Amino acid sequence: MEYFPTPAYKRSILLIRSVLSNEKARLDAIAREKGRKQAIGEDNFAEELPKILEFCDSYQNAFMRYLSAVLPQHSSKIQCKAGCGNCCHHFPMSVEPFELIEFYGNIRKSPDLLSYLEDCHFRTKAYYALLQKGMDACVEDPEDYALVNYFNKGLACPFVLASGSCGVYSTRPVTCRMYFSETPGEFCVPEHLLTEKNRSFIVYLPDEIEEQIADVSAHYADLGLPEGLYEGLLAMNAFESSFANAEKILESSK
């Protein structure tokens, strides 16, 4: 859907553009100082972590302001309600590296961390098995085949509570924040996914903003983080010592 440029829309675009532009300038300066293309590497991850987390919060808050500007433009009322969680059975992709970092930072001290990682591993294996099956069968779009069939498996996100609500709502990535439905949750299930009864939709950002996001994320390329949430969190676990070092840096600066 193409949104009408209301004053609220324009202000939200200016905000998110400014947040991304400032962060890119900061990362560009670090890269120049380091004499390399990417700003963030294992050598300065711990040192830069506080700024990364600060930026991620600003980015997600700006996106929420964008949602506030565009959702009222939809003719049908959004039917999403707390405790539904049906969309949380999809395999979450397109998670930015700085969001993975913030997400892992918020769960790393949880007593359920090991269980979370085991569940992430199981779901990642399930998705890639379906992807391989689609490629072996020479389907037209193996990724779409894998995503649809993964949803059919009914595997809830490891971070969904028994109540159906999100257990990490405040730090959920933008890929989770952009998913909505104009139909009740009873139609956001596998049997209705590809039918007219399901009117779920994704709120996309303008292409120019997506390009800015890509420019910021490019500075994390040396970390080699996957774009899927589950496999990304598994990869983040390898940076545990960097998080511990960042804590020491913060403590020493107080």
Task: Please report, for each region that a protein language model flagged, where it lies by residue.
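Short loop/turn segments that flank or connect secondary-structure elements
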Residues: 1-254
